[in-house]
């Protein structure tokens, strides 16, 4: 009888323990499972980094000369030098030998243009001679008085030993002939927010962005590397004519295409697109 009672109690104990080997009820005391499996492995979940705020690399140029270092006065009777450049020749071998330009065209390039290498040497030379770039609006002011509206020369405050210089770029429209004779083709805003030059290698026909071979971008880089060459961030001024557009974009009207010409609609659409494209530049 005792043996039967012991066997009966053992069977009841086994039946009590068996549910613990099966699936827990939703309302049971199941252990918590992390929602993100990576947490269980001790891994840190991926987090998208916040984009870094844009830092203007030329801010250091604009703030290089503090007011207490501008101890030299340059009055209205003293000369402010001026250098002007046409677009520079990025590929001189192509321009003067390989592009098929006529002899008179080559003479014209030699008379009115400089190569990118010559331009770089000129910048280095005026820098070493103590010149500093100034903004033309700091040199001249427009005033209105009893005699009317006119321009007056200002007195500049310069670092000791420096001489003021204005650089200007003429045309800056990148004529169609320039695209065939070894020049860059336009200015664009790069993904970094800075100005780049678009260029097509005349030998390989590869189009790319560069800061070499263009007067504007080369000066940007030179000033960035020599912040003491600029007063308050001054660089150059553009003397735009609007002839064949500006900055490499064909924004100009064409009076040879009549208003009622079938070609006018396509021309106006392209012109509007070019106007929008140049605005960020």
What does each model-found stretch correspond to?
Residues 5-9, 68-73, 107, 226:
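Short, flexible coil/linker segments at or flanking structured domains
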Residues 17-37:
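Sec-dependent signal peptide cleavage junction
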Residues 33-81:
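N-terminal low-complexity, Pro/Thr/Ser-rich intrinsically disordered segments
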Residues 77-280:
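Active-site beta->alpha N-cap acidic-glycine motif
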Residues 3-24:
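Sec-dependent N-terminal signal peptides of Gram-positive bacterial secreted proteins and lipoproteins
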